């Protein structure tokens, strides 16, 4: 894992350890949670591609999207799509 990837994962882990438990109730509508998804995406696809997948996932974590099970893709989506 690159230095950038390790740094991002550390920041996310700090969020999970320090900030997330202080929230009044769980708010992520997906499984795995958005922060865990981000860690998995960065570990699997690197800082840039994994960061993009995590950003897209966080943008979808809102009341207009039903949520549910949404694992990190094994391969980064290819082609002309603007999002995964």
Swiss-Prot record:
InterPro entries per record: Membr_insert_effic_factor_YidD
Compartments where located: Cell membrane
Keyword Cell membrane in record: yes
Gene Ontology annotations for the cellular component aspect, listed alphabetically: plasma membrane
Entry membrane topology: Peripheral membrane protein
Keyword terms, alphabetized: Cell membrane, Membrane
Function: Could be involved in insertion of integral membrane proteins into the membrane.
Membership in a protein family: Belongs to the UPF0161 family.
Name of the protein in question: Putative membrane protein insertion efficiency factor
Organism: Deinococcus deserti (strain DSM 17065 / CIP 109153 / LMG 22923 / VCD115)
